[in-house]
A protein has these predicted regions:
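Canonical Radical SAM [4Fe-4S] cluster-binding loop centered on the CxxxCxxC motif
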Residues: 95-132
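Conserved AdoMet/S-adenosylmethionine-binding subsite of the radical SAM
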Residues: 141-150, 155-234
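Conserved alpha-helical substructure of the radical SAM core
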Residues: 121-150
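Flexible, acidic/Gly-rich N-terminal and inter-domain linker regions that tether
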Residues: 1-100
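Short, small-residue-rich loop/turn micro-motifs
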Residues: 83, 108-110, 213-215
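Short linear Ser/Thr-Pro motifs
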Residues: 72, 105-106, 119, 189, ...
């Protein structure tokens, strides 16, 4: 079945209309999932029993299990999540004076092969769906009871190699009826997939972008980052 968290608001409206329901129900479902943080359709009490049954028959609500949690002396927490298909991903919660920031994964493993990155040791398996990305934020908020103020796409995987799902996740995170995190509090970190950088710049989203250089010249950067052979500094 489809994970209902994989839909942004407009897609969910379209999906509901396609199954004979009113589009405005999407806003109600969004509120239940992202603001009330319910874990089942049965808890969505302003939806009819008939609609709740239809949702249960056609969709799931993906909820992660925490496999392991580590906490450092400064309050930083690392989470290992079971993503319900036999794979696992990591997220890191960091506390700052301005709020709580989470570093999320966008893929299971990574293709980029950067020598300095721990993700290089994890073989690429697949990209995460939008809902699987967003669920990292929801699961950590549930565990801590605190609101996350900043999201950084700097965990396992290259975000721009999973462009469509990362973009959809950003739209869910930024939507006032969704997770409601300001776009300027969402940052995407990339090893430098230039065509996708241009694509992101053309989106109507004011998120921030960080490019990992790690060297001031192409020779040194290529020795550490294979992506530089395709998209170099020059």
């Amino acid at each position: 079945m489809k994970n209902i968290k994989d839909y942004d608001l407009q897609d969910l409206k379209d999906e509901l209309v396609s199954i004979g329901e009113k589009g405005f129900r999407a806003e109600q479902i969004f509120k239940w999932i992202y603001q009330e943080k319910v874990k089942s359709f049965d808890e969505m009490t302003n939806l009819s029993l008939e609609l709740r049954e239809k949702l249960k028959q056609n969709y799931t609500i993906c909820n992660y299990n925490i496999l392991k949690k580590l906490e450092s002396s400064d309050g930083t927490r690392k989470y290992l999540f079971d993503i319900l298909d036999g794979n696992a991903i990591e997220s890191v919660l960091m506390e700052y004076h301005y709020g709580k920031s989470i570093c999320v994964s966008s893929q299971v493993g990574c293709k980029m092969g950067c020598k300095f990155c721990a993700s290089t040791g994890i073989p690429f398996i697949r990209s995460l769906s939008a809902g699987e990305i967003v669920e990292q934020i929801l699961a950590v908020e549930q565990d801590t009871g605190d609101k996350i103020s900043n999201v950084v796409f700097m965990g396992i995987g290259e975000p721009l190699d999973n462009y469509d799902n990362v973009l959809k996740a950003i739209r869910i995170l930024n939507n006032p009826q969704g997770v409601n995190i300001g776009a300027r509090h969402i940052s995407v970190s990339t090893s430098g997939l230039v065509p996708r950088i241009y694509d992101l710049a053309n989106e109507n989203i004011q998120c921030t972008l960080s490019v990992s250089l790690h060297a001031s010249n192409d020779e040194k950067r290529s020795s550490m980052m294979p992506v530089n052979n395709s998209y170099n500094i020059e």
